[in-house]
């Protein structure tokens, strides 16, 4: 029997979930003492590194289950599940910081900027480079990329740029009326795009047929142990649960680092972006190396769009219900 198909294989593949559960138990029992005094930089660094590594490990396993679902369901649903699952982690972390920490009005905006810069410049550029070095020339569906950019640009303009030019509130603060408008527009635009991607124009987001003489796309999921649809559909949210639980403690550490240690407030958004995007970056690079540039574009541009489409409504809704300002 294959060692990866039995109970032992399942246990081995879900060690991250076990590590997350153990961390939750330890934090629940000893958390009040461990997180009560963070004045020691070494102790603070240890706690931050521990939680960051555990949450990153869990995030990679979320991506693994999403990749298995992608193999079972096909495109564009596979990439859609991947991007929404991973970006949901980011939204949860932002919500945790906003609800548990001191008022940080620019956190959501800093995270949006970080994600857009990392994805549209770093991740996309890296995947194009490694794909070109291996295959010289790759193809993707331009209509799909244009559809992504056609929604990313207005959403970014509305959510990041427009509040700086309105006079209803000082600086970049979002007034209640503007917040309601941005929530409705973000949900509407993102919803229309999802309808285009999953219903009307699915072919725009699938890998084009390889031209005669070109290299065929490889199976990038060959090293995955794909089990049943129900198994991965259950384990994906279960693997996200420890991240949700630990995000409150991580929020406290980020808030302490931004305040007490004098770190810039934008650092919190950058760290959250790195934590969330690292697994997706690996998936995008694997797709490029497998000559599936369309999946790479779906992951990269889908991450940017999902970030804006989900973070803006979530952040502004929390701001409206809690009374905390958002810029």
Model-derived features: where do they sit?
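Hydrophobic alpha-helical segments, chiefly the membrane-spanning helices
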Residues: 1-327
